[in-house]
Amino acid sequence: MQADRKALQQQLKEFKTQTGNFSDVVEQVLPSVVSVYVMDWDTGEEISSGSGFFVSPDVIVTNYHVIEDIADEDYFYEEDEVEQVLVETYDGKLRMAEVVFTGNAEEDLALLLITGFIIDPATGEQVESPEEYPPLELSFDVKVGDRVIAVGNPMGQFAATVTQGIISAIREPEEYEVGEDDEDEIAEVKVLQTDAAINPGNSGGPLINMAGQVVGVNTWGLEDADTINLAIASVALDDFLAGFEETFEGEPDEE
């Protein structure tokens, strides 16, 4: 009887997590999500845009394809060779960020480091204004049927947009083939298939469970199927972050 009661309590706990208040979860995660803009600094024109989210107070995850026009793949950037992008935080501040680490095109992940400078909207000049932001926690506990929320900047114009859906399938690399001319776009990582809308500009944003934890990185949606969208699973992101830490710790200290 006691075992049955514990099992029931666990089921109720899981049910409450799955049916959590949607607006509360969104309010919890929005401060950790940013819009990412790749700029031509000579002309001031936007090259591309996407989304990202904080995994530590000053480190942002996004997709590599969001920044591929200015950054090499599978690369650790030294301090004197970084490429800069513009990120817009939840409070509307335009903040400078640096590309510090990229995966290969198949991993499709990249890390940005925010600087202590924002763009003054009145003058367009950089102004020192250091700040830290709340990071999101990763979760590897995901099942088909789980409710999820995709957060991002669709079309590069609608920041902090949220859509909801479920995990439709969990696919290992050998179980799917997506891309032009039958060429895999992501061939090395586990992905989550969801019916939560992922539009251009959503790339790099978080796919969130009802506990406000990241279960995936929104990556792309199929053009001919509105309800088939793919996110890189958080376990692949965790491996990528571990690779960054290993590379960073292996760098020699400056004299």
Question: What spans do the regions from the language model cover?
Answer:
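Active-site region of chymotrypsin-like
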Residues: 29-45, 115-136, 160-248
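Active-site substrate-binding loop(s) of clan PA
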Residues: 70-76, 98-103, 117-158, 243
